[in-house]
């Protein structure tokens, strides 16, 4: 029997992987989780002889058991191709006393490409497998990176449309330019007056709107999600942690079975949850170090056992982590509750109603794999400058948060375990913040002048994703209030 998926909130209906990917969010508002976390059937030694596509297949076949070998391998081949600027797809580099897993070599230069390059292929295959005759409408909230990566993946894919909502004024200049210049007949980008949490909570509400679901069905449409709430986003991310470990083993940086700590800059909790899944599959991962910025709701949760979003929302230089409602944490809560959906549903209801919840002591004991800390704006900038000056390596703001938290972790624990840091975006995506951190003289430079200067000082070629927006025409300029999001979707679909 293959892996089946259930809601974290109690809906007892079982779904195959393809059905869960098509639906995105469970009908009761919960997230889909596998009935049991599968194990790898290959050793790390065996994986170390494989390329990225082969490792991805070995990991993903364990979760997506209703896809045939041919279907899954075709999806992988179509995703991880020459749209990535290195054959390694996700190379690991050794700098400043750690290993940086560079997840930004895809078409939109952020780690979201690792999953969103394959999600459209998984979804179109799922639609065929399930005889879905409706057009799939991808509805996505973005804190900056998901939106562009999702649009790049779904643009002009037959049988799909995509609507992306982003917080106007809450993303970097390059992130916004990437989105509003996106081509594709099936693509719509909308700024909202509000922050990412506003966008995400309204998108979730649209998913749960039964009246809207009926209206869409009558018009020949059905919703799905490209956010990390979709299990089809999460599963491909597990692969790169297995690949990184296997590469370090191949290169003699690790001995077989030696533990590797992993640091992940964290917002919506999907990327670090993928590392947790990799550890549970058998990848020898030690501590999972959760790095937050000034929006440190996760740091407080790991320290106190209480999750409380009732606080000021802070705009930082690491906007993809400017999040107070960390959606994927729900999958971990379900797990530490012993897969008890009633406990999880009660906590999520409390979060919805009161903006907070507290886990039991028994649940907290099951968080031993995790360590949480945060880096403020000054610490983040100082880390960018420090690593650049010591190693000539330029990192983006999110990676710098992780790097700074790693230094705090070592100072606090004395742990000398070798460590992998997830490098989640190209520094070119946040050139102003990166250059200002290196030298205050760059604070008032023009965006593309700073990009050119970053190229000069780093010796790293400007990515095609940045060059192509330099002179690209703005194609999307809609900005709406939160309450107008539903109407905006209906108008785009002609309903």
Regions found by a protein language model. Name each.
Residues 1-495:
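PLP-dependent amino-acid enzyme catalytic core
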């Amino acid at each position: 029997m293959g892996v089946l998926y259930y809601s974290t909130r109690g809906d007892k209906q079982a779904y195959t992987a393809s059905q869960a990917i098509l639906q995105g969010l469970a009908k009761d508002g919960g997230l889909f989780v596998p009935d049991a976390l599968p194990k790898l059937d290959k050793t790390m030694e065996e994986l170390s002889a494989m390329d990225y596509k082969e490792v991805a297949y070995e990991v993903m076949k364990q979760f997506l058991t209703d896809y045939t070998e041919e279907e899954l391998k075709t999806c992988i081949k179509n995703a991880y191709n020459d749209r990535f600027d290195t054959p390694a797809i996700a190379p690991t580099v050794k700098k400043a006393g750690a290993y940086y897993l560079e997840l930004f070599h895809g078409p939109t230069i952020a780690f979201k490409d690792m999953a969103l390059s394959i999600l459209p292929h998984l979804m179109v295959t799922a639609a065929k497998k399930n005889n879905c005759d409706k057009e799939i409408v991808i509805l996505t909230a973005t804190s900056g990176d998901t939106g562009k990566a999702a649009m790049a993946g779904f643009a002009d894919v037959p049988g799909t449309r995509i609507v992306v909502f982003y917080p106007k004024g809450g993303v970097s200049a390059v992130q916004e330019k990437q989105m509003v210049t996106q081509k594709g007949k099936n693509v719509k980008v909308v700024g909202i007056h509000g922050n990412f949490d506003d966008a995400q909570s309204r998108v979730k509400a649209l998913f749960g709107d039964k009246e809207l679901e009926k209206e869409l069905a009558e018009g020949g449409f059905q919703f799905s999600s490209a956010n990390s709430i979709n299990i089809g986003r999460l599963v491909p991310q597990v692969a790169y942690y297995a690949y990184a470990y296997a590469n370090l083993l191949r290169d003699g940086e690790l001995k077989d079975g030696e533990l590797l700590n992993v640091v992940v800059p964290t917002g919506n909790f999907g990327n670090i949850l993928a590392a947790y899944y990799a550890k549970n599959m058998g990848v020898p991962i030690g501590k999972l170090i959760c790095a937050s910025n000034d929006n440190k709701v996760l740091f407080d949760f790991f320290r106190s056992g209480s999750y409380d979003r009732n606080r000021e929302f802070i705009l930082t230089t690491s906007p993809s982590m400017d999040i107070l409602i960390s959606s994927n944490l729900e999958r971990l809560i379900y797990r530490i509750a012993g897969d008890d959906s009633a406990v999880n549903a009660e906590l999520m209801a409390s979060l919805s109603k009161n903006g907070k919840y507290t886990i039991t002591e028994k649940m907290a004991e099951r968080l031993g794999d995790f360590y949480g800390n945060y880096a403020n704006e000054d610490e983040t900038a100082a880390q960018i400058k420090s690593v650049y000056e010591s190693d000539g390596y330029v990192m983006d703001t999110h990676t710098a948060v992780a790097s700074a938290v790693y230094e705090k972790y070592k100072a606090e624990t004395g742990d000398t375990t070798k460590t992998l840091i997830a490098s989640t975006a190209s520094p070119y995506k946040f050139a102003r913040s990166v250059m200002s951190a290196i030298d205050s003289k760059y604070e008032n430079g023009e965006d593309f002048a700073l990009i050119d200067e970053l190229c000069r000082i780093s010796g790293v070629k400007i990515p095609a994703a940045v060059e192509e927006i330099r002179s690209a025409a703005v194609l999307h300029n809609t900005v709406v209030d939160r309450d107008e999001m539903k109407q905006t979707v209906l108008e785009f679909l002609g309903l």
